[in-house]
Amino acid sequence: MMKKSTITCDMEGRIETMNVGAEEVFGYPKEELIGKKRVSIFSPGEIVLQNVEGWLKEAVKNGIYVGKTNFIRKNGEKFNAKITIRPTFANGKHNPQTGYIGVTEVIDENIEVPINFSTKLIKALAITRMPFTSASLLPIFAVGAYFAGVGDDLFNTVNFILCIFGVLIAHLSVNVLNDYFDGIDGTDEENTEYFQQVSGGSRAIELGLITLEGTKKLGTILTLVALVIGGTVLTLTNPANVTSVVTITLAGLFLGYFYTAPPLRLVARRGLGELTIFLAFGPLITLGTAFAIFNGDLSMSQEHLMNCFYIGIPMGLLTTNILLINEFPDMKSDKNTGKNHLVVTFGKKASRWIYLIILLLAVYSTYVLANNLGNDLLLIPIALLVLYGGYIFSVLYKKYDTRELVTANWGTITMQAIFCIAVCITLLF
C-alpha cells in the first residue's frame, strides 16, 4: 500500500519539507524540490488557476480543507487523490500563519474536476500576459488624446483603432515568444523566488497551461496577425509617413523579438534590455502611432513630431522601472542563467538608486512636456510621480531584499497606469 504524502510549504507555496511518502507518491526525490519548487508543480495548471486559492481560503477559514482532485507525478502520470490541507503556524495558532501542510492519499476513484469557461479565459490571459498590455496601449491613447486636444481632424480614427489592435497583438506575441526563449534558456524553470503574477514570466509553461512548442506556435501566429493589421494600417497611412511607420515598426519588432531571443538576447547585455524597454514602450510607440494616424506629413510639423516624442519619454521610463523592480526577486535565477540585466550587474542595493534616477527623469521629462505644451494640468501627473513614486521608492529602499518588496512591484505597475491615464486626460484640454 502506498504511503501518505505529507508536504509543508510557506505562504507562497515554496516547498519546505516532504516525507518519504511524498517522494513515493509524486516520484520526486526531496532534494529536487525542497527550497527549489512550489507545490503547484503537483497539480494540472487549470486546477491551480481555478481551485487552489479556494482550497487555501477554506483551510484558513475553517482550519482544514478536505477534497478530492487530480495530481501529476514527475513522469507526467495523472492520478486521483484525497487532499487534506491545514494552515501552519510557527508558535501556535495565536501567531501569524507561516504556511500550509498538505496530506495526499492516492484513491481508487475516477475523479473529474470540471473546468469552468472563466478558468479557460484566465488561462488565455495568463499565457499571453494580457493585463500587462496597458504599458503599450496607454501611450497610443496619449497620442490620440494629444491630437484630439490640439485641433480638429488631425488624425485618422480608423488607423488609430487599427494601431490599438495591432500593437495589442504584437505585444501579446512578444510576451509569448519571450516565455518561449526564457523556457529554452531555463530562466523561468530556475526561478523559485518570483513574485506571483508580477515577475518570473507567465509561469504558463511551468504550470502546464501550454507546452514550450505551443508558445512558439502561438507567438508566431500572433506575430503574423499583427503584421496583417500593420499592413492594413500602411494602406490608410498618409503616403508621406509610410517610410517612417515601416522603419519604426521594424525597429519595434526587432527589439521585441531579440529582447530574449538569441543571438542578441538584449536582456542579458547589462542595460541594453532596459534601454530596449524604454524605447519600445516609450518614444518608438508614440512616434510610430503619430506617423500612422496623422492626416498630414508629420515630418513637416516639427511641433507635433517633437511633442509626440516627448510624450513617450516619461511613459517609457516608468515602464522601464516596472522591468527594473521586477528584476529584484528574479536576480538569483537570472544570474545563474546568464541574464545579466542591471540588477544582476550592480546588485540590489545599488539598483535602488537606478530606480530613483529613472523616476526623477520621468518627473523632469513630464515637466519639459508641460512646458512645451503650455499645459499646467500636466502638473497633476507630475505630483503623482513625486508623491506616489516617493512612497514606492521608500518601500524599495527598505524592503529591497525581502518578500515585502512585492508592495512596491505592484505600486510601480499601478503608478505607470495611473500616470498614463492622467496624461491622456490632461492632453485633451
Features from the language model and the residues they span:
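N-terminal capping loop/helix in small sensory signaling domains highlighted by a polar->aromatic N-x2-3-F motif
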Residues: 19-22, 339
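Short loop/turn elements at sensory-signaling interfaces that couple input to output
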Residues: 83-101
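PAS-family sensory/regulatory domains
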Residues: 32-46
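Intramembrane alpha-helical segments
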Residues: 201-297
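Terminal output helix/cap of sensory domains in signal transduction proteins
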Residues: 45-77
